Amino acid sequence: MLKLLKHELLSSYRPYLISLMVFIGVCLILPQFSSWIGIYEGLFSVVFIISTLVIFFTYLNIIYCFYKSMFTKAGYLTLTLPVNTREVIFVKLLSALIWLAIASLVVKIGTKFLSDAVIITYFENSVDKLVGLPQITYTNYYYVFNSLITLFFKTTSAILSCYFVISFAHTNRIRKNRIASAIGIYFIGLFVGAKFYDLLPQIMMSWLWFSAVFEICLSVLFYCDTVYLIDHKLEME
C-alpha cells in the first residue's frame, strides 16, 4: 500500500505544486508593493482571495485526479492493479488529505509571513477561518481536540462524497452528460443534507461530539458506497 501511495503522490503532484508555487510567489512579492496599494485592507483582500483560490483549486485537483485515474484511459490500468478497490480508494483519500494538509500549511505560513510584513493584526485569523483551523482563544484542550477531529472528518466526508458522486455518475443509471450529472447530483445532495441537518433534534445538536460522529458516519457511508459502485456497478466509457 505504501508503494501505491507513493505512486499516487508522484503522479499527481504537478497541479498542486504549480498552485502552491504561485501562492508563495505572491506572498513574497506583494509586501514590496504594499505602499502602492495605499491601504493594508487592499493587500489583505488580494491575498485572501488568492488563498481562497489555492484551497479551491486543491479541492478541484483532488476531484480531477480521482476522475482521471479511475474513469479515463488511465482507469483501466488502475482497475487492473493487484490490489482491491478498498485499498485504491483509501490510498486516493489519504493522498488527497496529504495534499490538502500541505496546501493549508503553505497558506498558513504564507499569510503569517504577510501578516508580519504588513502588520495586519486580523489577517492571520481570517485565513485560519478559510483553512478551517479552530480558533484557540483559551487553553481548552478537550475542545481543541474535538474541533480537530470534526475538521478532519468533515474534510474526509467532503472528499469521499465527491468520489461517490463521480462513481455514481459512471454507473449504468447515467449514460449521458456524466460530468454535468455528477455536478447536479452533488449540489442536490448538499441541499438535501443541509435540510436534513436542520431537522435534527436540538438536544442532539447540543452534544459536543455530535458533529464529529455525524461526519464519521458520512465518511464510512460514502467510502463503502463508492467501493460498492466501483466493484459492482461501474460502466466504463
Residue ranges and their predicted role:
Residues 1-75, 85-237:
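Hydrophobic alpha-helical transmembrane segments of membrane proteins
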